[in-house]
Amino acid sequence: MRSQGNMSDRLTIEVDCTSLGSNECPSMASSFSPMESPTPTPTSVYSQGSLASPTWHEGGSYPGQGYERHTGTTPMRSAFRLASMTSNDSMGMSYGQMEAQERMPMTDFLSGYDENVEHFWIPQEAQKAYEHGVPGLPYPQAMPQYSTMGRSSYRQHAAPYLPDSATNPCLSRSIFHQPERVPNSMSMGNVIPWMAPQPDSIAPQTIAPSQVAPVTPPPSYSEFSGSINTFKTHSPTTPVRSCSLGTTSGTDTPMSRLSGGMDYLDDFNQSPVYRDNLARVQRQPSRKVARKQSSKQSLSLENLPSIIKQVQFKCKEPGCKGRFKRQEHLKRHMKSHSKEKPHVCWVPGCERAFSRSDNLNAHYTKTHSKRGGRNRYVATLDENSPDYNPEYRGQLTADGRPVYNSKSQDLMPDARETSEEAWLE
């Protein structure tokens, strides 16, 4: 079985397994030609752990070679070697045609393998990743997902959750085959995949009146005031309706109404409660217009309170239309009509007289407390001046400053009192 070849064409690979015993995981050395495909062989990939090749099984026939097992003297190392072959050699004997004594047990070179074959169960119809007559073994493909992998241990799990549309006959049919019920914004590209029509799996269903619940209006419809009895209850008009995927009959379902059906919208607009509230909203003017209307009404005399019309105190002077709420206000007003002006300005050269004291104080502030006017400036009446003293009555300098310790200062208060007494008499 072993052929003669040049040693330079062979490459020896030794794998040490220090975690196992001397006879459990022997190091292996395989010889192959570097001129062949550099992809690793299943022997070097799947014999170092508890993995099984996804494309091998005992019944298959692939180019194989007999194992030569040798027991070494070292306690932690043993070796088995594939029969040497060159690039021109072909593996003639398959693993399934070997005798029982020539086969190496699986437990000797797979550390995680045991006698339970459930861990390495491989379907017989699995596609092989090699071809007959091609020297060398290509790199095995990844483990595919087989539909036959569901064994008895996996069948004990509970059935997966199914949506209501898969069990309810009323929701199991597709609503997208009804062009008059579908709004323009929806298209078949936006349909959820599990809601797509499947003619092979869904059969035509028949809906009885007992299976269809009365459709209630949307939540926003209940905000309108009114009796609940005015709402229209939608019920099927025919006793039995036959629904199928291929027909486009006028079926009435909750999904069709919620998806924007025009029939339900028409019924909603024809409700008396909706019409009354819509008319009430249309009759209400805007806030800006209502504010203008209220301001116009408030300007008219008819809308004024009655207490304003009842004026108690009127001026008796001919031609005067003065009206006052309080008597003291009328008395002060009457002094303006009389010739009595007891309040006289004390500033030399001014001598202006006023019937009211507040008018005199305003005269001091506006006339004599400012510089540069035509009237005389008085520093004692200027709040910003260091000589500010509104109680001062006396002589003034040319620039309006007070002159203290003068006889006129002592006589001025007496003269003022005399003049006031004369005016009062």
Curated annotation (Swiss-Prot):
GO molecular function: DNA binding; transcription coregulator activity; zinc ion binding
Keyword field contains Protein biosynthesis: no
ZnF start-end (C2H2-type): 321-345, 351-376
Coiled-coil region(s): none
Chain intervals for the UniProt region annotation (Disordered): 28-72, 232-257, 281-301, 365-425
Record PROSITE patterns: ZINC_FINGER_C2H2_1, ZINC_FINGER_C2H2_2
Keyword Zinc belongs to the record: yes
InterPro entries per the UniProt record, alphabetical: Zinc_finger_trans_reg (IPR051061), Znf_C2H2_sf (IPR036236), Znf_C2H2_type (IPR013087)
GO biological processes: conidium formation; regulation of transcription by RNA polymerase II; sporulation resulting in formation of a cellular spore
Segments of skewed composition (Basic residues): 285-294, 365-374
GO cellular component, one term: nucleus
Main location: nucleus
Subcellular location: Nucleus
Entry keywords, A to Z: Activator, Conidiation, DNA-binding, Metal-binding, Nucleus, Repeat, Sporulation, Transcription, Transcription regulation, Zinc, Zinc-finger
Polar residues compositional bias, start-end: 232-256
Phenotype reported upon loss of the gene: Forms aconidial fluffy colonies.
Compositional bias segments (type: Low complexity): 30-44
Function: BrlA, abaA and wetA are pivotal regulators of conidiophore development and conidium maturation. They act individually and together to regulate their own expression and that of numerous other sporulation-specific genes. Binds promoters of target genes at brlA response elements (BREs) containing the conserved sequence 5'-(C/A)(A/G)AGGG(G/A)-3'. Also coordinates the expression of carbohydrate-active enzymes and of the key effectors of cell wall remodeling during autolysis.
Name used for this protein in its record: C2H2 type master regulator of conidiophore development brlA
The species this protein was found in: Aspergillus niger (strain ATCC MYA-4892 / CBS 513.88 / FGSC A1513)
Species lineage: Eukaryota, Fungi, Dikarya, Ascomycota, Pezizomycotina
